[in-house]
Amino acid sequence: MTEPIIEFKDFSFKYNSQAEPTLKNINLKINKGEKILLAGPSGSGKSTIGRCLNGLIPNIDQGEVKGKCLVNGKDITSTSLFDFSFTTSTILQDADSQFIGLTVGEDIAFALENDCQPKDKMHQTVNQWANELKIKELLTQSPQSLSGGQKQIVALAGVLVDESPILLFDEPLANLDPASGLKTMAIIDKIQKELNATVIIIEHRVEEVLSQLIDRIILVNEGTIVADQPTNQLLHSNTLEKIGVREPLYLKALTAADVNLSSIKEVDQISTLPVSEKISDKLAAWTKQAKITKKEVDNLPLLKLDHVGHQYSKNQPYPLKDVSTTINQGDFISIVGQNGAGKTTLCRTICGFISNEGKITLKDQNLSDLSIKERAEKIGYVMQDPNQMISQKMIFDEIALGLRLRNVDEETIKQKVDQTLKICGLYPFRHWPISALSFGQKKRVTIAAILVLEPEIIILDEPTAGQDWKTYTEIMSFLKHLNTMGKTIIIITHDMHLMLEYTSRSLAFAKGKLIADTTPIELLTNQALIKEASLKRTSLYDLAKHYNLPDPNKFVQAYINFEQQNWKDEDYE
C-alpha cells in the first residue's frame, strides 16, 4: 500500500490567541500525486490546515497541538521551516507578503538562487515561466507596482520554478481575471502531471477549479472535515451550499429546470454531461415559461468622464488612456477586463488618489476642484487589499472610525455599526481584534467601514474575492438593496456570475482602453470582446450550447431572473 504524503491523525490545533480550537479531531490522508480541492466557508479552518502543511504551524503560529500531522513522513512538531522549504511550496492568499526581489525577474529567481543554480540556468527557467504565464514584459518591473492579479501570477511563477513535491495554493484564483484563472488551473494541472506533484488548492471558486479534473474535494466547516469524496460523488449531494460554498452554476440551472442529477453519472464538467433530448426539452420548456423583466432606468447623469487617462511611468506598457463615459444615478456597474488593463487605475483617478488627464465631473462639478476629503464624502472606495485601509485595532472601532470623524453621536454610531456588522456577517466578531481575522474577514471589515458611511457612489475593488458563498450573497444583496434605494454602485470584479446577476451595465477594459460599455449578457456573448478583455463565457451559456437550445442568451437571462426573484427581501431599516 502507498504511504500517504500527508496524514492527519486525530489532529487538533488551538491558536494561543483563541479560546477554542480552530481544528478539531482531523483525520485525513492525501497520497502522492493527488490533486485535492480544500473548500469551506471563511473561518472554517481551511487556511489553518494549509499552515500545518507548510510548517507555519507550529514554527510561526504558536498554539496547542493534539494528535499528529505528518508531511512527507515527518511530524510537523519536529520539522523546521528550513526542512519544510524542500517539501512544500506555497502561494499565499496575500501575494505582497511573499515578495522578495526588487524586480519581478529577481523574485521569480529567488528560489533558484537559494538552490545555487547556475546563472544561465536561472535565466532560462525564469524566461520559461514568464513566457508560459505571459508576464515577460513585467520582468523588469517592481512587484509592488503591479495590479493585484499580476502580483498573484508572479507569486505563482516563483513557486512553480522550484518543483517541490507538494504544491499548496491558498486562493490562487482570487485576484485573477477569468481567462487567467482558467490558464492558471491548466498550468497547475500540467505541472501536477509532469512532476507527479501533490497539489492542494484552497479555493472558494469551485466551478473555476473544476475546469480541470480534481481527484477529491474535502469540505471543512467549523474546524472539522464534513466531506471527503471524489468530485462527482460530492457534487451529487447538496453539501456545498449547505455549508456556504457556491455550487457550479450550471448544476443549479439544471436543478432549477427539474433535471434529475442523480441519473447523471459525471457532472463535474459540462462536456461530460449526456446529450439527451429529454434534458434539452426540459431546459427549453423552463426557458420558455420564465418571466423576463427589465428594470426601467431614468438615466440621470451623475458622474461624467471626459478623455480621462493616467500613466504611472514612461515604461508602463498600457497606460490608462482616453476613457469617456457617463455614470448615471442609480447605475449598478461592473468594471471588468484583463489584469493590468486599468480598472483600478480608473477608480483611483475618480477618487482623486492619483492625478488624471481629461476631466471628471460629479453633478456638473469638476472634481479637480475638490480635496480628497471632500471627494470621500461623495465617493466611497473599498480597496482590493484590506491591509492598506485598516488603521484601528478593534473591529467595531475600525467600522465606527468614519462616523466618529464626522462627529456622529455614539448612540447612532452603535446602531449603524451593529446593523452593518450583521449585514456583512461580522456581528459575532464585533469585539475581536483585527489581528485575529483571516484575510477574507479583514476584507469584510473594510467593506463595512465604507458601507456604514452611505456615500453617493460606492466603488468596490473585488469585494467578493476570497469570500465564501454565504458572505458573498450577504454583501451583494446589501449592495443591491442600496442600489434599489438610488445609490450608485461601481464594482471592479473578475466574477462573471456577479456581473450577470447583480449589475445592469458593464465597462470592459483591455490594455488601458475602454473597449465596451454594454449589458453583461451582451458582453459575455460577444466572443471577440471576451477574448480581448480576458473574460470567459458563463457556464449557463455553455450549458445552453451543449444542449442546443435555440436562444442561449434567453436561457442565461431566464436563469438570472429566476435567481433575482428568489432573493430574500431583507429588512435593512
From Swiss-Prot:
Entry's EC annotation: 7.-.-.-
Binding-site residues, ATP 2: 337-344
Chain ranges of the ABC transporter domain: 6-247, 303-536
Cellular localisation: Cell membrane
Entry keyword tRNA processing: no
Positions annotated to bind ATP 1: 40-47
Membrane topology classification: Peripheral membrane protein
Predominant location: membrane
InterPro entries registered for this protein in UniProt: AAA+_ATPase, ABC_Co_transporter, ABC_transporter-like_ATP-bd, ABC_transporter-like_CS, ABC_transpr_CbiO/EcfA_su, ECF_ABC_transporter_ATP-bd, P-loop_NTPase
Keyword annotations from UniProtKB, A to Z: ATP-binding, Cell membrane, Membrane, Nucleotide-binding, Repeat, Translocase, Transport
One GO MF term attached to the UniProt entry: ATPase-coupled transmembrane transporter activity
Gene Ontology CC annotation, any one: ATP-binding cassette (ABC) transporter complex
Alphabetical list of PROSITE patterns matching this protein: ABC_TRANSPORTER_1, ABC_TRANSPORTER_2
Top-level EC class as recorded in UniProt: translocase
PANTHER family tied to this protein: ABC TRANSPORTER ATP-BINDING PROTEIN BC_2655-RELATED, HEAVY METAL TRANSPORTER
Family: Belongs to the ABC transporter superfamily.
Function comment: Probably part of an ABC transporter complex. Responsible for energy coupling to the transport system.
Name by which UniProt lists this protein: Putative ABC transporter ATP-binding protein LJ_1704
Native source organism of the sequence: Lactobacillus johnsonii (strain CNCM I-12250 / La1 / NCC 533)
